[in-house]
Swiss-Prot record:
Species, as recorded: Desulfomicrobium norvegicum (strain DSM 1741 / NCIMB 8310)
Any Pfam family matching the protein: Cytochrom_CIII
InterPro entries noted in UniProt: Cyt_c_III, Cyt_c_III_dom, Multihaem_cyt_sf
Upper lineage: Bacteria, Pseudomonadati, Thermodesulfobacteriota, Desulfovibrionia, Desulfovibrionales
Name of the protein this chain belongs to: Cytochrome c3, 26 kDa
Residues binding heme c 4, per UniProt: H77, C105, C108, H109
Amino acid sequence: ETFEIPESVTMSPKQFEGYTPKKGDVTFNHASHMDIACQQCHHTVPDTYTIESCMTEGCHDNIKERTEISSVYRTFHTTKDSEKSCVGCHRELKRQGPSDAPLACNSCHVQ
């Protein structure tokens, strides 16, 4: 299966009605992540061959709880499993040696 990959995508928790995020949007650059398999982040690929936003309804759309598997926050920030979140993966890269993978909040979240 082949997919057309956008150069970048902007992820915004502002999409959730009634929620005011504390941090700004995140623009994800696919080019910097081309050595990572799509299904590493888009876990529905092997089953449905569709690529949806991480915050699609029914996937990671829980904005109230930070620890639930459906949590928007956990999806991007957990450090318990380096293969399951942005921060976890970036932290693992830094642990392995010099890396320019961002870890500071404002490195990804633009106000």
